[in-house]
UniProtKB/Swiss-Prot annotation:
Pfam families: HIG_1_N. Residues 20-106 form the HIG1 domain. This is HIG1 domain family member 2B. Its main location: membrane. GO terms for cellular component: membrane; mitochondrion. It is found in: Membrane. It comes from Homo sapiens. GO terms for biological process: mitochondrial respirasome assembly. Residues 1-46, 103-106 are cytoplasmic. It comes from the Eukaryota. It is a multi-pass membrane protein.
């Protein structure tokens, strides 16, 4: 019967350095781009998505207001409009992804 024992590593582990694997060189990825810069860049690349998001939020807010006022017909209309706005936003995201995938790399 084999006994279990501790395995001693060849070199001591240092938490400040990444492990070294054969054929893999670790790189540190640093992105100086902040949230604002990334948001503006993504908005310039695909401006339809933020428009769809704002339309969805506006319709949702108006629907909640109609619901709070007790206007069920307006509230129901806003629910249907919200679904259409969400579909528009999803379609814009998918078309943006397709356009990015088809764009040739520089």
């Amino acid at each position: 019967m084999a006994t279990l024992g501790f395995v001693t590593p060849e070199a001591p582990f240092e938490s400040s350095k990444p492990p070294i694997f054969e054929g893999l060189s670790p790189t540190v990825y640093s992105n100086p781009e902040g949230f604002k810069e990334k948001f503006l860049r993504k908005t310039r690349e695909n401006p339809v998505v933020p428009i769809g998001f704002l339309c969805t939020a506006a319709v949702l807010t108006n629907g909640l207001y109609c619901f709070h006022q007790g206007n069920s017909q307006c509230s129901r209309l806003m629910m249907h409009t919200q679904i259409a706005a969400q579909g528009f936003t999803i379609a814009a995201i998918l078309l943006g992804l397709a356009a990015t995938a088809m764009k040739s790399p520089p």
